[in-house]
Amino acid sequence: GKIIDCKTGETLVQHEFPPELIDPVCTFARYWNVMPLTYDAKGIVTEDAANPYVGEEARINKIPARQVENLPAEIQWPINKLLLVGDPVDMPHVEELMQQKFAGKLSIYRSAPFFIETMPLGVEKSASLALLLKNMGLGPENLMACGDGWNDLPMIRYAGMGVAMG
């Protein structure tokens, strides 16, 4: 939910996760044996830094994971998303239940077999790319987008040339 101009460091757009939904999302995730995490300036913040899927997120992004007692109580800063991590066998069902429970409140997509992204409503890659193209005076016909996750489908469809990678 955040777009930063890499040249200037200026934040062009920031969509903050609704603070009133942090605890309900974390409670729901825990109920289904899924681990919520978010990020601060130092890396990942989670209730179980030893969770193998938390470790995978840390490895992918080359950042450390810090364990806290209670994630919702710990979050005292604006966040852009909560990432839910868990067993790939369970995640399609959990994603479906989350989409039902938080319909009209959050955007929810699986980005990998073991990751569910929960973001402010309307936040998705295609909307962000549309904003960037508009700022550049361009349209989707000028965009090539490649993606390899379920959360990439809207972006791939939006682009003039969309490529789904295996």
Describe the predicted segments one by one.
Residues A159:
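C-terminal catalytic core of tyrosine-transesterase DNA break-rejoin enzymes
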